[in-house]
Swiss-Prot record:
Its EC number is 7.6.2.11. The keyword ATP-binding applies. CDD domains: ABC_PotA_N (cd03300). The lineage of its organism: Bacteria, Bacillati, Bacillota, Bacilli, Lactobacillales. Residues 6-236 form the ABC transporter domain. This is Spermidine/putrescine import ATP-binding protein PotA.
Length: 361
């Protein structure tokens, strides 16, 4: 039986009569790394603040280990939060910052020292106890903030966009460190970000949010390979999205041509949207291509060229290729049936999951 450490049931949150969360329901299993992913204003940080006890719900229920916690104050919850700005005390050294919560609990000096040293060891800052916060880099401050959170041995660690202020190289390094730390500690992490690459890299499960709703939930691979709708396909990774018609199971038409695919379970001749990822398209000769396009522009992205093409109907196609293309040239695009992903309009996540299971069996 799965142990759901946190559950939301039909949670609504309003600020000044403006709904921020709209009947949100989900379950969080113990010991996993979860990410709330979405654009600014989608409600992801509000969920974090409700779990932490900083915000009340307007209606609905929040459960922790099966017990309703709507009225439980923040200091009585088994959660700790790492904030975007770290919220460290600049007048205290590293030891005193990490020990702050333990001193409030009135633990003995020996126990505090033991726990602080262990927390600093876990975040790879052993021997930094007397270092002043002002003397530390952004990455080191990030680790101190995490140490201060985990020293209290929370059951759930909440992280509110903690990597956003770091440069790209350090942010990438911290992704590895956070993932490794979560696996070593075995506690539940709930991470908030608008950065889809962070979410894909670190998470066991992702909740994609938009306008106060959880639009889709699943593993990073599921979210990337099987987006439920236009928003998810466009927000998570780069996508080419065109209108199409589902002629029958495993046969779809778009840009005036018929293509084999692996999707099914839809009505015959149902209007749909078709997704092809840029990395799944290969530039080839006109004879070998399934689509004919004209190369418009290209940018070198380091690991690949990002090539923008247009087909004869005016649809834009982005291609990721290790080879440079000739601008203005007519070329073919090839792809495999399994590279095509077909999306229905206004399909619920429950219906979407049921349809996938029906033709995966």
């Amino acid at each position: 039986m799965r142990n759901h450490v946190i559950s939301f049931e039909n949670v609504v949150k309003q600020f000044d009569d403006e709904p921020v969360l709209k009947n949100v329901s989900f379950e969080i299993e113990e010991g996993k790394f979860y990410t709330l992913l979405g654009p600014s204003g989608c409600g992801k940080t509000t969920i974090l603040r409700i779990i932490a006890g900083f915000n009340d719900v307007t209606s609905g229920d929040v459960y922790f280990d099966g017990k309703r916690i709507n009225d439980v104050p923040a200091n009585k919850r088994q959660v700790n939060t790492v904030f975007q700005d770290y919220a460290l005390f600049p007048h205290m050294n590293v030891f005193d910052n990490v020990a702050f919560g333990l001193k409030i609990k009135k633990l003995s000096k020996a126990e505090i020292e033991k726990k602080v040293k262990e927390a600093l060891r876990l975040v790879q800052l052993p021997g930094y106890e007397t270092r002043e916060i002002s003397e530390m880099s952004g990455g080191q401050r990030q680790r101190v903030a995490i140490a201060r959170a985990i020293v209290n041995e929370p059951k759930v660690l909440l992280l509110d966009e903690p990597l956003s202020a770091l440069d790209l190289k350090l942010r990438t390094a911290m992704q590895y460190e956070l993932r490794d730390l979560q696996q070593r500690l075995g506690i539940t992490f709930i991470f908030v970000t608008h950065d889809q690459e962070e979410a894909l890299a670190m998470s066991d499960e992702i909740f994609v949010m938009n306008k106060g709703h959880i639009v889709q939930s699943g593993t990073p691979v599921d979210i990337y390979d099987e987006p439920i709708n236009h928003f998810v396909a466009d927000f998570v990774g780069e996508s080419n999205i065109v209108d199409g018609v589902m002629l029958e199971d495993n046969l779809v038409s778009f840009v005036g041509k018929k293509f084999e695919c692996v999707d099914g379970g839809m009505r015959k001749n149902e209007p749909v949207e078709v997704v092809l990822r840029p990395e799944d398209l290969t530039i080839t000769t006109l004879e070998k291509g399934k689509l004919t396009v004209t190369v418009d522009t290209q940018l070198f992205r380091g690991v690949h060229y990002e090539i923008i093409c247009f087909d004869e109907q005016g649809n834009e196609w982005m291609v990721h290729s290790t080879r440079k293309a000739k601008e203005g040239a007519q070329v073919g695009l090839s792809f495999e049936p399994e590279d095509i992903h077909v999306m229905r309009f206004n399909e619920s996540e429950e219906d979407f999951d049921a349809r996938l299971e029906s033709y995966d069996e």
